[in-house]
Amino acid sequence: MHAANPVNVAGLLLAAGAGRRMGRPKALVELGGVTLVERGVRLLTAGGCRPVVVVTGAAADEVGIVVRRLATRRVAGPAPAGWDAPEIGLEPTAGLIPEVRLVSAARWTEGVGASLRAGLAALVGTDTDAVVVTLVDQPSLGAAAVQRLISAAADPGSAHPAMTATYGGRPAHPVLLRRSVWPEVAALARGEAGARAWLRAHPGEVTGVPCDGTGSPADVNTPADLETPADLETPADLASGDTHTQPG
């Protein structure tokens, strides 16, 4: 049995990519007047995640400036032994968004797997029970989807160590991972697979949580994708915590 229902749920925003098809790092792209990295942080915060860890790579300094608008100090330390992760830099905030931390993934060019490993490693020494993972290039996700995953995982009848949002029955982000499976997920996270390798290898340990009507998991990969984003929450929604919900 993989255990206990989460009490403390962190958010993990993977924002390290170079965005080659976009022409610049997606984290710095603005949509609705908000950079995608800030939008992702606000999404996870509005969904109930504390802290929110942002993993950077390409244009780390520039992305860090955006996040540091909320941050006040830096704490550095080595990665936990055996996690194959770089030196971790954590930056707690004390401003608009509580508890936001920056983690630099030195091996980000290897793919999203390296970013996921670095993010999980940063949370090993915390009291976090589970983590909700999102990607910076999915700006139309709804905070209500994050809330549904956390609620489903907290259900006393829920024993599965992983949850995925589903849209029309198809699994997508956000993904919730209990602490008990982080080492297994990290071991399989290579290249562009991220958590997908573990999820596919353990279908019987994954709960699908219907999130239709909460937003869209559609990626933005090119400038053309920015012209018609699906179900985009406004900056005011993200700031206030108001989110897409399914009627009824």
Residues of each region from the PLM?
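Nucleotide and nucleotide-moiety/phosphate-recognizing core
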Residues: 2-171, 179, 202-213, 224
